[in-house]
Amino acid sequence: MKSAEIREAFLSFFEEKGHTRVASSSLIPANDPTLLFTNAGMNQFKDCFLGLEKRAYTRATTSQKCVRAGGKHNDLENVGYTARHHTFFEMLGNFSFGDYFKRDAIHYAWEFLTSDKWLNLPKEKLWVTVYATDDEAYEIWNKEIGVPAERMIRIGDNKGAPYASDNFWAMGDTGPCGPCTEIFFDHGEHIWGGPPGSPEEDGDRYIEIWNNVFMQFNRTADGVLHPLPAPSVDTGMGLERISAVLQHVNSNYEIDLFQNLLAASAKAIGCANEGQASLKVVADHIRSCSFLIADGVTPSNEGRGYVLRRIVRRACRHGNKLGAKGSFFYQIVAALVAEMGEAFPELKQQQAHIERVLKTEEEQFAKTLEQGLKILEQDLAGLQGSVIPGDIVFKLYDTYGFPVDLTADIARERELSVDEEGFEREMEAQRERARSASAFGMDYNALVKVDADTRFLGYEGTSGSGKIIALFKAGAAVDSLAEGEEGVVVLDQTPFYAESGGQIGDCGYLESAGMRFDVRDTTKAGGAFLHHGVVAKGGLSVGTSVKAEAEASVRQATALNHSATHLLHAALRQVLGDHVQQKGSLVDSQRLRFDFSHFEAIKPEQLKQLEDIVNAEIRKNSEVETEETDIETAKAKGAMALFGEKYGDQVRVLSMGGDFSVELCGGTHVSRTGDIGLFKITSEGGVAAGVRRIEAVTGAAALAWLNAAEEQLKEAASLVKGSRDNVLDKLSALIERNRQLEKELEQLKAKAASAAGNDLAGSAVDLKGTKVLAARLDGLDGKALLALVDQLKNKLGSGVILLGGVFDEKVVLVAGVTQDLTAKLKAGDLMRQAAAAVGGKGGGRPDMAQGGGVDAGKLDEALALAATFVEQGL
């Protein structure tokens, strides 16, 4: 069976068993700061297992894309050198959230693996492990499934602590945990290795193909296991591993998925396909790089972007080892899309973007790779011992962009190692320098803990009423706030929008008899809305009912800008491509700021096109439609979701212009697109690697911006004695006239310099038979002094010249030495001395050099150095 057929068979099997087929989640974990990348099928269901989230189903099956590179789970250094390590892999999984448990999970696994309708694996080739004390699982395998005791192994606490075992899974030191049972495939006696638990278990004969985790306990801080009321199941089977078994090969790189990628890699590099480790590295890395880029990661020097950069650069370096000339890595994307694009349509949609990002990164690395390798060669030539010091590793990282694992790769090939601890010390020193130069603010929301939810009334209007359910002062819960005190008010319901999704929080006031609380900002802590402000009059206490009034004009102006960001997002994807994804936004009453993924500056004509598209949608005055629906229905309708944003089962879908813009959004918006009035882009630029930013204004602010531009145009027309209609012609004529005058001025300067040269040549002095000329000429720039030195060299025939002067409040210096003297006297050496004397720097060729400085008071002393320089040099 081909890998694609195995994937589909697995998902279909569990659908027949009542499971809901759930799409793979993004490689960027949603709202989980503990994870760098999605690395297991259960990641997207974590809150379901913790009981924090309810879904419409209790059984699920997925084929989850996973990356293990960087962070706790890092397979990068082993990739290419072993049969089964990858940076990217697919994890097939079936999950039960308080539904079925051990018996069904084990029976399902055995049926899928051994039934002639499904994988039809020989039963005698399968071995099973269970946790040492999990008699229930053992009995199911032995008595119900019929696995003989000689092919079953109990695995105890083999990692040095209670419940620390290959067959006991835990989410952390406390929380859900439980035993697991693993299924192994025996590749046969011709391959070295022993069964799990034996001294030879690290061999390749017995390979784990499926792990079934039974979450049946909650571990408390005292280490005691308490049974969970609704035990769950989490399973995982690596697609690449089971494909190797079914395709009768012992290495994942021999399966159909990799055979095509290896061939494409060899073709792009221009080398033979002979199973080289470097070729495997390239074939593996094109998968992780392409999927990461498709999910919105771009190469950078921090976080996920840096891991991506490391993987790309490692692939490029291994391609170069195989003889690649020029950019090759991006050329393999097409083969990957052909292989996996049907199962993961985001690859097809983003193909052009993936290729562009990889090509740009490869070209950027090529500029420093050769130079960095030369530096490394020089350092290795003088190396004492077999360890590359941490400071050298850091220098290659910091100056030449060599990730530490790339240097480690090179070291491995020479039977060397790297001082990773020394490298980390250098990195920490750099981080400390960065911390010292930064200032950090406090997140006051983090101080406020509220075990309550606030109902939002703001979609219907800006007025409402609510009851105070909590008060905070300086982060501590209080029963009341007095007049003049600052604090936080939490209501059971409110019309105030709390800052989220890039939209700022509302301001306004809360009021009751004899009391007024001025709300300066509104934020969120969990489901609670926090009204930050000050008691302007009277006092307030928990339990009081208040009138809540958000500032309507600010809310409306903010709504214009928020709705405009949706139109802009859709227009960007239309003009630039589907690779555009929102990376951040800020929406307030004055303007909008929208950050998005794109690898180059937007051309002026594209900016105009964006404005035209958005304003056309505004003029259509179409209704802005909102709908509450489940997340899967919303996605099926094409609703765009923000990467990294976590959504519940029920979401709010916002549509503008029919299907022109369909996004998931909880913000406040206009009723019709025509309410926006006008859209005008005010700036565009880069904010990070692969991220661009557009700032714009709408409505009255856009009109004010255009009026100001009109006034500037009128003022410019007045200055050139023209009108609005001919100001460009007038300016063009003025610029041309200015160019002519500058040309004439240069000619006059040349004549003046020639005349000055005739006069200066006669002032040269003779030192040890050499003519030396040093002179001060204020008011001439470096270009004029260069021309004059050239002229004087011709007039003197043989000699040393140093000219200097003050131009634009800075010292300008030029030195010249005739060709016959450059063996002993070099203009660059003279310039370094003279420039240093005036507090500056300089240098150049033996016959001509330039420099400058800031201390005009020392200029005469600097010029006097010419004579000393000649006397000492001859």
Curated annotation (Swiss-Prot):
Which Enzyme Commission number(s) are listed?
Answer: 6.1.1.7
Q: Where in the cell is it found?
A: Cytoplasm
Q: Which reaction does it catalyse?
A: tRNA(Ala) + L-alanine + ATP = L-alanyl-tRNA(Ala) + AMP + diphosphate
* Classification via SUPFAM superfamilies: Class II aaRS and biotin synthetases, Putative anticodon-binding domain of alanyl-tRNA synthetase (AlaRS), ThrRS/AlaRS common domain, Translation proteins
Q: Which SMART domains match?
A: tRNA_SAD
* Entry note: cofactor: Binds 1 zinc ion per subunit.
Name the PROSITE patterns for this protein. AA_TRNA_LIGASE_II_ALA
Pfam families registered for this protein in UniProt: DHHA1, tRNA-synt_2c, tRNA_SAD
A single GO cellular-component term from the record reads:
cytosol
Q: Which GO terms describe its molecular function?
A: alanine-tRNA ligase activity; aminoacyl-tRNA deacylase activity; ATP binding; tRNA binding; zinc ion binding
Query: What are the coiled-coil residue ranges?
Result: none
Predominant localisation class: cytoplasm
**Keyword terms, alphabetized:** Aminoacyl-tRNA synthetase, ATP-binding, Cytoplasm, Ligase, Metal-binding, Nucleotide-binding, Protein biosynthesis, RNA-binding, tRNA-binding, Zinc
Please list the residues that bind Zn(2+).
H562, H566, C665, H669
Name the cofactor(s) required for activity, per the record: Zn(2+)
The family annotation for this protein states:
Belongs to the class-II aminoacyl-tRNA synthetase family.
Q: Domain description from the entry?
A: Consists of three domains; the N-terminal catalytic domain, the editing domain and the C-terminal C-Ala domain. The editing domain removes incorrectly charged amino acids, while the C-Ala domain, along with tRNA(Ala), serves as a bridge to cooperatively bring together the editing and aminoacylation centers thus stimulating deacylation of misacylated tRNAs.
What is the stated purpose of this protein? Catalyzes the attachment of alanine to tRNA(Ala) in a two-step reaction: alanine is first activated by ATP to form Ala-AMP and then transferred to the acceptor end of tRNA(Ala). Also edits incorrectly charged Ser-tRNA(Ala) and Gly-tRNA(Ala) via its editing domain.
Q: Provide the protein name.
A: Alanine--tRNA ligase
Its gene name is: alaS
